[in-house]
């Protein structure tokens, strides 16, 4: 990825935002395995703020073996074992708000996933205006496999997408849409 300048315009231990030129802000993870943690979540909010103020678009891209392996479940487990419920609630709420900020941003947001795009990584893509996925992209809301409900608005975005084809003014029985959306 071509970057303008020698340093990111924003950054912390979990993620960075770079000026890519042509009015585009690039957002990339620095966390272990491109996992989502408090630092990544904080940087999502800062990057959207900066992009809406100083840029015309934002692209989410990553380096490494996978686009994103989802939430750092070891950090989640550690917080749960220490009964840090308020910290967990805040992390989930901030991430949900972050993915929704992408969705409702005043600038277009494009995600460029590749390889493993799991859990929260897929939810980032679902919150984006457009997705340019690599041919070998394997995506899923895999949290269910460890007994968790996806927490970054992914299930809501799946349901909204299933309702997009319903004509305006029609009041459908949404049960059929819900079961079809979540049956797999």
Placement of each model-derived feature along the sequence:
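Conserved catalytic cores of soluble enzyme domains
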Residues: 88-92, 96, 100-184
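A structural preference for short, pocket-lining loop segments at secondary-structure junctions
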Residues: 22-28, 41-86, 93-112, 134-138
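Short beta-strand/loop segment at the start of cytosolic alpha/beta domains
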Residues: 1-31
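A broadly conserved detector of short glycine/acidic/proline-rich loop/turn motifs that flank catalytic sites
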Residues: 31, 64, 162
